[in-house]
């Protein structure tokens, strides 16, 4: 019955309804995963969008395997980019790695650049120190070797650094990339410097405390002078 509903005239509604039960029903989830794998390529864009949204309840590997071709075909549609991102559910870093290795994503296109920025920002919001350190290490190389993906990742991280009000991610030490920011051109240097707002490391807290102490001392002297 589920299979017939998913390809019938009520298919979009069927996907929405069945995904609610699939999260707690492994058998139904397996059926949905198989049906999505077999029908997404021939589905109308509206149905493909719903399949992308429903993929949030899929098992990790099936989810990533399905969302990659969907993102590749429909990356120029903002709603699809949002749908894929919402279904990744903390798997943005793994998805980023997957797309980075995909030859279909080697060529630069503005929608792809936007999507990479969205993925990088999502990784920053998640705040996993290991994932963020890996991204910083990827970006820590000469500017001449930067490709469009690297610049998009840096833009996404820097944008999130400007907007984020979340607690800073604790690192074991200051990232080497931040220490070498002045070795890059003005645009990249500015974005790299912004990344410092995402992190805290031994020594950074001391500097901030010292700056705050100096400010308080200055205010105290002004009050005493009055």
What are these regions (language model features)?
Residues 1-226:
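Long, ordered, helix-rich scaffold segments
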């Amino acid at each position: 019955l589920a299979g017939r509903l998913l390809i019938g005239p009520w298919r979009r509604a069927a996907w929405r309804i069945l995904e609610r039960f699939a999260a707690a029903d492994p058998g139904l989830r397996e059926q949905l995963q198989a049906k999505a794998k077999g029908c997404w390529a021939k589905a109308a864009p509206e149905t493909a969008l719903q399949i992308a949204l429903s993929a949030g309840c899929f098992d990790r590997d099936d989810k990533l395997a399905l969302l990659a071709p969907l993102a590749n075909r429909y990356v120029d549609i903002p709603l699809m980019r949002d749908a894929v991102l919402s279904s990744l559910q903390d798997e943005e870093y793994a998805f980023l790695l997957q797309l980075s290795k995909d030859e279909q994503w080697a060529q630069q296109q503005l929608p792809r650049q936007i999507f990479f920025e969205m993925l990088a920002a999502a990784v920053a919001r998640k705040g996993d120190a290991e994932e963020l350190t890996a991204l910083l290490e990827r970006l820590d190389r000469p500017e001449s070797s930067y490709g469009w993906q690297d610049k998009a990742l840096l833009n996404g991280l820097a944008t999130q650094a400007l907007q984020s009000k979340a607690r800073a991610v604790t690192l074991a030490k200051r990232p080497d990339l931040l220490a070498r920011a002045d070795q890059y051109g003005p645009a990249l240097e500015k974005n790299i410097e912004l990344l410092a707002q995402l992190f805290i490391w031994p020594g950074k807290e001391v500097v901030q405390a010292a700056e705050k102490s100096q400010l308080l001392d200055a205010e105290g002297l002004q009050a005493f002078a009055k």
